[in-house]
Amino acid sequence: MNVQEALNLLKENGYKYTNKREDMLQLFADSDRYLTAKNVLSALNDDYPGLSFDTIYRNLSLYEELGILETTELSGEKLFRFKCSFTHHHHHFICLACGKTKEIESCPMDKLCDDLDGYQVSGHKFEIYGTCPDCTAENQENTTA
């Protein structure tokens, strides 16, 4: 998904174009990580000083409903990112320190299906959490300094 595809999808579903919506979508396009509503508000606050959490959440929910954004939850907080445009099946590693994601090509369901004989699986989501190499290196530098 990219910004133009997302804007077209909004238009096709009867939602009007606004600079605010485009800027919010651009924020996700420029990020390789999951973002919280607070991240979005902080990033857009200078350009839109009266922007509220309600407006942010309403748009994030709309984007999720239309399949523009995908979500995950960490420590009880919902995080958002552009829906992957990859056409192949994959999963993600998510850095708990910075939110950056890395695509994982292999799928554990390939091995688990044998254990689910007779069950009809309708879908699955697999995420691995930890610390990315950049954050690990930064953490090691901070502890040795």
UniProtKB/Swiss-Prot annotation:
Pfam families according to UniProt: FUR
Effect ascribed to mutating residue 89 to A: Decrease in repressor activity
Principal place of residence: cytoplasm
Alphabetized CDD domains for the sequence: Fur_like
Annotated source species: Bacillus subtilis (strain 168)
InterPro entries: FUR, Fur_C, WH-like_DNA-bd_sf, WH_DNA-bd_sf
Entry's Gene Ontology cellular component terms: cytoplasm; protein-DNA complex
Domain of life: Bacteria
Family membership: Belongs to the Fur family.
Outcome reported for the amino acid change (mutating residue 92 to A): Decrease in repressor activity
PANTHER family: FERRIC UPTAKE REGULATION PROTEIN, ZINC UPTAKE REGULATION PROTEIN
Name used for this protein in its record: Zinc-specific metallo-regulatory protein
Variant or mutagenesis effect after changing residue 70 to A: Does not affect repressor activity
GO biological process: negative regulation of DNA-templated transcription; regulation of secondary metabolite biosynthetic process
Domain remarks in the Swiss-Prot or TrEMBL record: Contains 3 zinc-binding sites. Site 1 has a structural role and site 2 is the Zn(2+) sensing site. Site 3 residues do not bind metal ions with a physiologically relevant affinity, but contribute to dimer stability.
Summary of the function given for this chain in its UniProt record: Acts as a negative controlling element, employing Zn(2+) as a cofactor to bind the operator of the repressed genes. Required for the zinc-specific repression of two operons implicated in zinc uptake, yciC and ycdHIyceA. Also represses the expression of rpmE2, the gene for ribosomal protein L31B, which is expressed only after the end of exponential growth.
Keyword Transmembrane helix: no
Quaternary state and interactors: Homodimer.
Variant or mutagenesis effect after changing residue 84 to S: Decrease in repressor activity
Keyword set includes S-adenosyl-L-methionine: no
Localization terms from the record: Cytoplasm
GO molecular function list: DNA-binding transcription factor activity; DNA-binding transcription repressor activity; transcription cis-regulatory region binding; zinc ion binding
